[in-house]
Regions:
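N-terminal export/assembly leader peptides and their processing motifs that target proteins to secretory
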Residues: 23-143
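Hydrophobic membrane-insertion alpha-helices, especially the h-region
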Residues: 5-21
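Positively charged n-region of N-terminal signal peptides that target proteins for export
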Residues: 1-3
Length: 143
């Protein structure tokens, strides 16, 4: 009888430990996604200058490099279902939309020099369906 009670207690303790561990891992994942999204979400529907645009592009490129996101034949990052981030920027003075790769290829320092006093606004954001991480930002020049 004692042996049966001990076995049941050990099984119950193992189940509680497993549930606690799973919940802890889930909360850790949620916190990491929230921390990642916070880097970009402060720019959503807000006006900011060209220097901040350079920061956004650098964050997106650093994320893609860190997560080994592949590039296509034109040098643009391929969208995946988990970690990729894309940024497109519409410039009113040229009436064209540029990808972050195009702007980065023209050197971020040139972007900062030419657009540091120009205002931009992030008007569209998309999230990965699988993990709710930011996957796409559309930014428009507003002045």
């Amino acid at each position: 009888m004692k042996r049966t009670i001990i076995i049941i207690c050990v099984i119950a303790i193992c189940i509680v430990i497993s549930i606690t561990y799973a919940y802890s891992m889930y909360k850790n994942d949620v916190n990491q996604v929230q921390k990642f999204n916070n880097q970009f979400s402060k720019y959503i529907d807000q006006e900011f200058f060209g220097t901040e645009l350079a920061t956004i592009i650098n964050l997106a490129i650093d994320n893609n490099e860190k997560n080994n996101i592949a590039k296509d034949t034109s040098g643009k990052y391929v969208t995946d279902d988990l970690y990729s981030v894309r940024v497109d920027v519409y410039m009113t003075d040229t009436q064209k939309t540029y990808s972050m790769e195009t702007l980065n290829a023209g050197e971020i320092s040139n972007l900062v020099n030419n657009y540091s006093n120009i205002q931009f606004k992030c008007t569209k954001v998309e999230y990965h369906k699988s993990n709710k991480r930011i996957s796409y930002l559309y930014i428009e020049q507003i002045s």
